Amino acid sequence: SKVNYNVVPWATFTDPEVARVGLSEQDAKEQNIAYEVTRYQLDHHDRSLTDGEAHGFIKVLTQPGKDKILGVTIVGYHAGEVITEFVFAMTHGMGLKKISAVTHIYPTLGEANKFAANAWRSERLPQKYFPWLERFFAWYRS
């Protein structure tokens, strides 16, 4: 089968590690490709905290309004291993919704991928329902 060079990952084994697959923001800008950015900070990620490596981030570029992954950059502890789930998803045309739906073992570094996907989902919640939900939960708690 043909090699899809858009999904060939790379990693730099520094401290912290840097791993990437697909487009970076700079690539997308240079190619005039529209994108949205979702960023998940690893500062409060349980496994990273347990290992004393709670620094770094996962940055995911997606098509505007869609969960299609255009590129991922991970800076952090074992980034070269953590990125493989995104490589698999991009290779098989799966988006962030699929990653969000996967049950991950707790606490693992790979679980951060799910948190990044969930961050994407939470940024796209329908805002029109929030005032109603706030009133409902205020009533429910009283």
Explain the meaning of each model-derived region.
Residues F13-S142:
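Flexible, glycine-rich terminal cap/loop adjacent to redox cofactors
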